[in-house]
UniProtKB/Swiss-Prot annotation:
InterPro entries: Arl8a/8b, P-loop_NTPase, Small_GTP-bd, Small_GTPase_ARF/SAR. It comes from Dictyostelium discoideum. The keyword Oxidoreductase does not apply. This is ADP-ribosylation factor-like protein 8. Pfam families: Arf.
Length: 185
């Protein structure tokens, strides 16, 4: 980006609000709803119930209004994932980094989703949630277990977070807001 583009983008950010849409998917119990609650309410809510179908929340962070689609992770709702991922600015795939027995199932669910032609080129953010728990996998291990280096044709990023303790939520939001100007399909 050259100097003049930077100045133009700065003035745009002052006068025009940006909107972005994100879809959060992942296996049940991975922490999708907790993450949405932390982003929208600024803190952890103890009694989070599993999402049946989907929930949507709008949140404003700075000059960006974010529409967050939280889709249920139970097997019966996974067929809905593609529909809610079409045309979004980014897909957020949430993984319980402490539940190692489900890594292979998470990998398969992720591959099934991102291999859908309508979702080509949509940026993917993988969040390895629950890093506050013992034996949780770090970023490098998550990248390896989910074969994230094998994903081509889209930007892919992975962060280790704790939605419960608000660890790395800021860098996660920064990455997502950076992609708010991504072209929607």
């Amino acid at each position: 980006m050259n100097f003049f583009e930077s100045i133009i983008n700065f003035f745009k950010s002052l006068f025009w609000k940006q909107e972005m849409e994100l879809t959060l998917v992942g296996l049940q119990g991975s922490g999708k709803t907790t993450l949405v609650n932390v982003i929208s309410n600024g803190g952890f809510i103890e009694d989070t119930i599993p999402t049946i179908g989907f929930n949507m929340k709008k949140v404003t962070k700075g000059n960006v209004t974010i529409k967050l689609w939280d889709i249920g992770g139970q097997p019966r709702f996974r067929s809905m994932w593609e529909r809610y991922c079409r045309g979004v600015n980014a897909i957020v795939f949430v993984v319980d980094s402490a539940d190692r027995e489900k890594f292979e199932q998470s990998k398969q669910a992720l591959q099934d989703l991102i291999n859908k032609p309508p979702l080509a080129k949509i940026p993917l953010l993988v969040v390895a949630n629950k890093n506050d728990l013992p034996n949780s996998a770090g970023v490098d291990e998550m990248i390896q277990n989910l074969d994230l280096r094998g994903i081509v044709g889209r930007e892919v990023c992975c962060y280790s977070i704790s939605a419960k303790n608000s660890v790395n939520i800021d860098i996660t939001l920064d990455w997502l807001i950076k992609h708010s100007s991504s072209v929607k399909n």
